[in-house]
UniProtKB/Swiss-Prot annotation:
<keyword id="KW-0150">Chloroplast</keyword>
<dbReference type="GO" id="GO:0008033">
    <property type="term" value="P:tRNA processing"/>
</dbReference>
<keyword id="KW-0819">tRNA processing</keyword>
<dbReference type="Pfam" id="PF01824">
    <property type="entry name" value="MatK_N"/>
</dbReference>
<keyword id="KW-0934">Plastid</keyword>
<keyword id="KW-0694">RNA-binding</keyword>
<dbReference type="InterPro" id="IPR002866">
    <property type="entry name" value="Maturase_MatK"/>
</dbReference>
<comment type="function">
    <text>Usually encoded in the trnK tRNA gene intron. Probably assists in splicing its own and other chloroplast group II introns.</text>
</comment>
<dbReference type="GO" id="GO:0008380">
    <property type="term" value="P:RNA splicing"/>
</dbReference>
<dbReference type="Pfam" id="PF01348">
    <property type="entry name" value="Intron_maturas2"/>
</dbReference>
<dbReference type="GO" id="GO:0003723">
    <property type="term" value="F:RNA binding"/>
</dbReference>
<dbReference type="InterPro" id="IPR024942">
    <property type="entry name" value="Maturase_MatK_N"/>
</dbReference>
<dbReference type="GO" id="GO:0009507">
    <property type="term" value="C:chloroplast"/>
</dbReference>
<dbReference type="GO" id="GO:0006397">
    <property type="term" value="P:mRNA processing"/>
</dbReference>
<comment type="similarity">
    <text>Belongs to the intron maturase 2 family. MatK subfamily.</text>
</comment>
<dbReference type="InterPro" id="IPR024937">
    <property type="entry name" value="Domain_X"/>
</dbReference>
<keyword id="KW-0507">mRNA processing</keyword>
Length: 499
């Protein structure tokens, strides 16, 4: 594998033609074995791993050969030598082959991603899902329509094999992949992210995620030609000009002298704004244009996916939303665009006058109702928001109880610190403070008043040291209540938000 990575810098096509040979490398099955038992330590030498207490590498080789010779319904591990199994079921060897099938395609992808990330040694903020929101904060206010797309799920394993055929020229590897996917055909696609594609068991989650990511990459690759047609709209600066009509009139007056240059500049200003964001199974395209243009986009996307993957895409999977009327949910936020009116005094040579400047502002809001519903599901409060004590935690120490409630509050605040309104977050803090006091009161068989008098300011604020005050800017009295902060260390969605 090291040699393959070295050769990948010189000739990438070799990786696509000889992947099948890697399936017979013992190192891959050592990796698969270690992953099967969820071990994080270093791998043992292969001379020790080929014994009966580990696995029979020869049996796996024969299983792969048996797969290629099977016709019809393929059950490759039914005739394995049971004397060599030593207590392991046939699914154990199936997991080894699937582990090899997962590790082999990851080699070209890892080399490709390694080359693309050169020069970004310790910069990891690109993994943050909150990096989506600063982009949307700058771009979405200049769009008026949104296409909310749910990536269509595959219905047949042959479609996935066809997509792999575009970049893998190794026929034996494709045949083996086809056989394995057909074997697991009864485990079809689920909308659950833990059961993404074809293989739903926990042991095969790694292969499932790889297949899903590759399939999502293929879906996005269809949009590249369309993106190139609108390449002039990328990274355009947007400014709010006062008195835009006189501004354009002045440009028209200069057309006489600089006709070609001004024509190109005007074309840039009129160019449509198109922005694309994807997270897991959802894709969002923000457009600036008419409703007819948005309907054409939905029509073309539907036809592209149907022709490319030979599957039927339900129209409800591409939802059209208008910013001026509705808000949409993404990553635990309710996002909308609101109109903001500012009073501006314009001073001229002889006189001055007051005018109103109307601008669009990106408005992310933490969904208070959904957060309360999630807290109610975890039994911190009822559905209306009334606090409930956690009797299961009364056996813990006081510090552990305080730390657990503080940790929940920190996670909620840290994730939703980009909200434009903090009232909902203050309500979450109030809801969590009372269950904390009730839990301590039940433990000490006293009242909430006694608990508050005993702990004082330590109640619910024990894990907020002073050095964190510079980070918690939205709750500082000297800061605006509408200030938004997007933390770049968030790499997964808040588990308390189910939207």
């Amino acid at each position: 594998m090291d040699k393959l990575q070295r050769d990948g810098k010189e000739d990438t096509s070799r990786q696509r033609r000889f992947l099948y040979l890697l399936l017979f490398q013992e190192d891959l099955y050592a990796i698969a074995y270690d992953h099967y038992f969820n071990r994080s330590s270093s791998f043992e030498p292969m001379e020790n791993s080929s014994s009966n207490d580990r696995f029979s590498f020869l049996t796996v080789k024969r299983s792969i050969s048996r797969i290629r010779q099977q016709n019809g319904s393929i059950i490759p591990f039914v005739n394995c030598d049971q004397n060599r199994l030593v207590g392991h079921s046939r699914s154990f060897y199936s997991e080894l082959v699937l582990g090899g099938l997962t590790a082999v395609p990851e080699v070209p992808f890892s080399i490709r991603s390694k080359h693309s990330l050169e020069g970004m040694n310790e910069w990891t903020s690109f993994r943050s899902i909150n990096s989506i929101f600063p982009l949307m904060e700058d771009k979405i206010p200049h769009s008026n329509f949104l296409l909310d797309i749910q990536i269509p799920h595959l219905t047949h394993p042959e479609i996935l094999v066809r997509t792999f055929r575009r970049w893998i020229q190794d026929a034996p590897f494709l045949n083996l992949l086809r056989s394995v996917l057909h074997e697991h055909r009864n485990l079809t696609i689920s909308s659950n992210l833990d059961q993404l594609i074809l293989i739903a068991s926990k042991e095969n989650k790694r292969l499932s995620l790889f297949l899903w990511n590759y399939y999502a990459y293929e879906c996005e690759s269809l949009l590249v030609p369309l993106w190139k047609r609108f390449s002039h709209s990328r990274s355009l600066p947007y400014e709010s000009f006062i008195e835009r009509t006189p501004f354009y009139q002045k440009i028209k007056n200069i057309v006489i002298f600089y006709h070609k240059y001004i024509k190109k500049s005007l074309w840039f200003l009129k160019d449509p704004s198109i922005h694309y964001v994807k997270y897991r199974e959802r894709s969002i395209i923000a457009l600036r244009g008419t409703y007819l243009l948005v309907k054409k986009w939905r029509y073309h996307l539907t036809n592209f996916w149907q022709c490319h993957f030979h599957l039927w895409l339900q129209p409800y999977r591409i939802y059209i939303d208008e910013f001026s009327n509705n808000c949409f949910s993404l990553l635990g936020y309710l996002l909308s665009v609101k109109m903001k009116t500012s009073v501006v005094r314009i001073r001229m040579l002889d006189d001055s006058f007051i005018t109103h400047l109307i601008t669009k502002e990106f408005d992310p809001i933490a969904p208070t109702t959904l957060l309360i519903r999630s807290l109610a599901k975890e039994r911190f409060c009822d559905i209306s928001g009334h606090p409930i004590s956690r009797l299961a935690w009364t056996g813990l120490t006081d510090d552990d109880i305080l730390d657990r409630f503080d940790r929940i509050w920190r996670n909620i605040f840290h994730y939703h610190s980009g909200s434009s309104k903090k009232d909902g977050l203050y309500r979450m803090k109030y809801i969590l403070r009372l269950p904390c006091a009730k839990t301590l009161a039940c433990k000490h068989k006293s009242t909430i008043r006694v608990v508050r008098e005993r702990f004082g300011s330590e109640l619910f604020t024990k894990s907020f040291p002073k050095e964190r005050e510079s980070i918690l800017l939205p709750f500082s009295k000297t800061r605006s209540q509408r200030e938004r902060i997007w933390h770049s260390d968030i790499i997964q969605r808040n588990p308390l938000v189910n939207s």
